[in-house]
């Protein structure tokens, strides 16, 4: 009879037991002496065993399996103080095994745990939507794993205590890729970077930066390059580090060559260059490191010319009319090609001013602009030469007379089609006039490599008469010689 009563369902009701008395078997409710814990569920031999719910006074609770008084097996736990929840396997009161942890701040973790910490393989999504899948240790990303960041970047490789360290590959959202060594979450050690602009760097990295990165553009050759009028010439360029070593680890930067003519308004400097600009075509002069300003001048690149490149005068003459400054200013590349000058808009045809050959990609720190020459002055740019006799008149003008001195158009070549004595027409000149010019090589890599472009470099150029390295001289007593 007593055995039958033990099987009566009514005997399993919690009302038969006082909350202050620990139940022995079956279902019961028990409030612990410190009143912080309350248990509702199955008992066996005076211990929580089977399915039950343990409630905490702060609002936290666990519901699931118990074994011999301990939270062990499958269950669900809610922490009131953090708002986090866990559903999965437990061992001795701690999440252990496989489970899902959801965070109140956002995100969740699904995978293996040990003593409540992420341990082993798992999948973690944080509150920003960033996703990591791989190995964990001591609650941190550790070992092999891959992560997709909120900006779209993706990393696959080694981790050490939540930081990328070891060997890994980073696929950037902009198309750039880095493959190599990492330390403390940045590029460090041997690696290769393929930038979205087409620039590549293969070599050592230190604290996230290339150790042998190019810092400046250098044009090889004499300080003053002298070229015979109408002759093509070649310009060799190097990208150099701060110590002057060639940046051989770097390739792919896009360099653009452009030209300027010396801008002179004073009569005493007219022999080096003087161009009178129409108001409609006047451009803002650009300061050069040679002590004078220049204005943009057309430059052409071609592969077919009659003269040999050997006509370039290799020896540089000293004693320039204006002293050369030691400092080299940084020129914004936008000054010559405007905003939005990207590779996609480069012309494909050659033998034209500003053609695609005026753009060269660097290969292992070096580039060459082959068969380049200066063309004829553009419309609105008229070359003039002051005569010595006129300089005397200019010096004898009344004080305060600000009117420009008399000038004559130069007779180096016809400016436009003119009639010869035999009735034929002389074609306009296709070569630059004698005088001083400036070549400029600028970095137009787009987008800029690692957010920066190299400063523009300048090369001093002098155009000389064919067969004579001296500029024409007009005696004072024969002003009509050039008329």
From Swiss-Prot:
The keyword Repeat applies. Residues 418-427 have a biased composition (Polar residues). The modification Phosphoserine is found at residues 18, 403. Residues 394-404 have a biased composition (Basic and acidic residues). Residues 392-427 are annotated as: Disordered. Coiled coil: none annotated. MORN repeats lie at residues 39-61, 62-84, 86-108, 109-131, 132-154, 155-177, 178-200. Keywords: Phosphoprotein, Repeat. SUPFAM superfamilies: Histone H3 K4-specific methyltransferase SET7/9 N-terminal domain (SSF82185). The keyword DNA-binding does not apply. Disulfide bonds: none annotated. It comes from the Eukaryota. It holds the Pfam family MORN. PANTHER family: MORN REPEAT-CONTAINING PROTEIN 1 (PTHR23084:SF263), PHOSPHATIDYLINOSITOL-4-PHOSPHATE 5-KINASE RELATED (PTHR23084). This is MORN repeat-containing protein 1.
């Amino acid at each position: 009879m007593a055995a039958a009563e033990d099987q009566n369902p009514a005997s399993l009701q919690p009302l038969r037991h006082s909350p202050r008395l620990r139940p022995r078997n079956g279902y019961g409710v028990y409030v612990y002496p410190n009143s912080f814990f309350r248990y509702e569920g199955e008992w066996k031999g005076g211990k929580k065993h089977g399915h039950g719910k343990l409630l905490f006074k702060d609002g936290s609770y666990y519901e699931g399996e118990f074994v011999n008084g301990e939270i062990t097996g499958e269950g669900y736990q809610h922490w009131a103080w953090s708002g986090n929840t866990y559903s999965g396997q437990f061992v001795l009161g701690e999440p252990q095994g496989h489970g899902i942890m959801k965070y109140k701040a956002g995100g969740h973790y699904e995978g293996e745990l040990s003593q409540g910490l992420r341990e082993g393989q798992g999948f973690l999504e944080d509150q920003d939507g960033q996703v990591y899948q791989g190995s964990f240790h001591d609650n941190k990303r550790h070992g092999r794993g891959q992560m997709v960041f909120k900006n779209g970047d993706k990393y696959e490789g080694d981790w050490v205590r939540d930081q990328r360290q070891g060997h890994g590959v980073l696929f950037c959202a902009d198309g750039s890729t880095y493959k190599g060594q990492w330390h403390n979450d940045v590029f460090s050690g041997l690696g290769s970077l393929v930038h979205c602009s087409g620039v590549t760097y293969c070599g050592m990295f230190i604290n996230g930066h290339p150790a042998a990165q190019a810092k400046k553009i250098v044009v090889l050759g004499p300080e003053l390059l002298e070229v015979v009028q109408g002759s093509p010439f070649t310009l060799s360029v190097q990208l150099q580090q701060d110590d002057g070593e060639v940046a051989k680890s770097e390739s792919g930067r896009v360099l653009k060559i452009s030209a300027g003519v010396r801008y002179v308004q004073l009569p005493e400097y007219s022999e080096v260059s003087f161009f009178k600009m129409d108001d409609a075509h006047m451009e803002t002069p650009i300061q050069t490191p040679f002590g004078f300003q220049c204005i943009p001048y057309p430059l052409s690149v071609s592969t077919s010319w009659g003269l040999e490149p050997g006509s370039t005068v290799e020896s540089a003459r000293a004693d320039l009319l204006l002293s050369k400054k030691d400092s080299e200013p940084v020129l914004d590349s936008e000054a010559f090609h405007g905003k939005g000058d990207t590779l996609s808009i480069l012309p494909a045809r050659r033998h034209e001013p500003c053609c695609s050959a005026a753009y060269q990609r660097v290969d292992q720190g070096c580039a060459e602009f082959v068969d380049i020459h200066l063309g004829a002055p553009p419309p609105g740019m008229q070359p003039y030469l002051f005569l010595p006799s006129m300089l005397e008149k200019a010096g004898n003008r009344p004080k305060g007379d600000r009117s420009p001195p008399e000038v004559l158009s130069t007779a180096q070549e016809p400016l436009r089609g003119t009639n010869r004595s035999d009735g034929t027409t002389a074609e306009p000149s296709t070569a630059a006039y004698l005088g001083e010019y400036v070549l400029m090589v600028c970095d137009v890599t787009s987008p800029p490599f690692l957010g920066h472009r190299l400063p523009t470099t300048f090369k001093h150029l002098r155009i000389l008469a064919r067969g004579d390295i001296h500029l024409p001289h007009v005696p004072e007593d024969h002003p009509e010689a050039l008329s």
